[in-house]
Amino acid sequence: TYTKAEPGTHPTNRYNHRHEWRIGVSGDPKRPKIPVAGNNNTSAIQWGELRQVMAGTTSLVGSGSAKGLLRNLDTNVQEGLTEKPIDYDTFPLNDTGGERLTSGCGYPSIHKASALTAIDAYGPHISEGINDEARNEFLCTSSTLYGGQRLVEDKTAIIHAIGLTAQDAWLASARGASVIWSPRSNISLYGHTAQTPLLAKVGVSIALGTDWTASGSMNILRELQCAADLNEKQYGNFFTDRDLWQMATFNAALATATNDVLGQLQVGLVGDVSIFIGTADRKEHKAVVRAGVEDVALVLRGGIPMYGDAAVLEALGADDAGKCETLDVCSVPKRLCTERETGKKLADLETAAGKPIYQLFACGVPPKEPTCVPFRDNEFTGMSAADDPDGDGIKGAADNCPTVFNPIRPMDRGAQPDTDGDGFGDACDPCPLDSNHAMCRKPDLNDEDGDGINNAIDNCSTIANANQKDTDMDGQGDVCDACPTFANPAGAACEFSVKDLRDPARGLRPPLGTKVTIKNLLIVGLRSVKSFGFHARDVGTDLPYSGILVFQGGTKAPAATDGTPLQVGHIVTVTGNFTVFSEQDEVDTVTSVVITGMDAAAAALVTDVKTRDLTGGMQSAAERLENLLCRVKTVTARATLSATDDDFWVSDEAAEMCTGTTPGCTRVSDFLLDGDKNDGSPKYAAGTALTEIQGIVSGFANQYALSPMTLTDIKP
């Protein structure tokens, strides 16, 4: 879909995670959102496909499709093939809103592993970035820990896979997963790319793909050029030309589960063949790896000529009643069968695609081509020097891989990864998980994490823990136990108080997605109109960080598991998943609510605060007061949120006019009153004096508000 746009300009600071350039979540003006227009019509999609045909491509996987030209292997538009479409998944975590986690799997929703049984190939975008958030995506798609799903399997081709460790690569290899590598797009956006020498060493099959034109290559030949340049300058020629060629052919067919019909010159396959012209310095596989579009002599899709030297197509009689036209390509006459495939001549197709549009081909380096030279401002230049041959910014003896590019990523804790501690960096270590190179092991499905312990007896089979430490003796190793000091055998819920979950000073916060049980939880507010559930806190008077939202969802008023309607003052025991939604800590996926007592007087305990206290921010007063019953006194209504929103601003400071989200103001929300109906009630004119307002403190999207539960909570 995104092949019409010409490449954009990327900041020299580079990005750390895809959501930074997608929607600007970093908030850093030096890492802005990149605006990119998609292909908005069939002709634009066909124009992008034609660009790839001229490079020798016959099949692709990606967003959007159109009839003619290429086989779209993720759809049924396969130009004669009847393969099961690959499940192409741009957001396997359903994180389109930019959700990022450094631990736990409390994403909006993760693709179900059970869905893989109905398909032959799965292509999810995973770990597109270089920080902890990117690495966590792999953890949550390779294991069921903390609410994750086991999506990394032998039918999975991980797209990007930049933020992986050596142990992640080992696990992917043990499972038989492959990786789809897009070096130009990765380098231009992040300055880093997937650690392909490491992946290859542990046995991961690597396929090559261009990604989109906004940050990637114009066509597969330019992507091969990029891979070859990295191989020569950054990887010490780790890959052969044959290896690189195979990434664009057989390995790509393996990744899409089409190797039974595509990817090889073999009797019985469908005959997708591209022939290239070699030269004295471009022989054999290098004739493809270092080719330009002018060097493509013939492209056959199922034996049907699509593009090539004019003389060759004419000799084959591939004119199709004038539906193939001649085109000068870098001073070489070519023929291109555009009208036969799209119903339009080339000029008409370009017009129909609309402007602006990226050119069809280039002779040599395309204009505005995104860089393939690794670079991050003030970190590394990607340029070889006597004291830094691989250009990774680490000089001389300090570099644990002097000739293989392995700069330090934000996820690497300030050091080049060396998992086995033998002095050889993972990127260049022939045995990255074994310090004894004479006993170099290969990834084994029976030891997925590579710690030397068979899965069947490993107390943490997806995270390496050779010492098998299990403090609480519950059968789960400490490294994968959300509560290592509280026994929860067989994945039972961990018991926490709300303060355990939320107070940073306690240091007990578990990964998001952890199944938890909270006892002695006092209900202080009900969500009875919309987004049903309740606000509750730990029993007692130690209030900061003691409040939490229990989200029950559905369409019914809050109730216990036995159906008893819940009331303010009920003391309950709750079991569900600890997570974050729109910056608010909460318990969702609730499996049990049991009433254990009643204390209406304690539930009525209100905390008096100043309007300035309810200004947001990490570890602010407002965050400490989330989901507690609070009150502001002697305030003045200053302004409504907007003409169509009943929320209004109040302040207890005479000089504060609340012209925006200023520090001295509190937002009063009608969410608990009427579910944000915006029906004109409650409404207070600017200047109205109010004796007090009490309600529940909410922190939705880090925009704190006081939510009265009844109109009597607002006193004139």
Question: Model-found features: residue ranges?
Answer:
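Extracellular calcium-associated, cysteine-rich motifs in secreted modular proteins
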Residues: 379-495
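Beta-propeller domains
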Residues: 118-137, 154-160, 164-171, 183, ...
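Active-site microenvironment of metallo-dependent hydrolases
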Residues: 1-91, 112-113, 246-387
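Loop/turn positions that initiate beta-strands
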Residues: 119, 268-271, 569, 688
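Metal-coordinating catalytic core of metallo-dependent amide/deamination hydrolases
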Residues: 41-47, 57-154
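Structural preference for beta-strand elements that scaffold enzyme active sites
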Residues: 59, 121-123, 155-157, 178-180, ...
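His/Asp/Glu-enriched, well-ordered alpha-helical/loop segment
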Residues: 143-156, 192-278, 290-305
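Extended non-catalytic accessory segments flanking core domains
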Residues: 316-317, 321-381, 484, 488-716
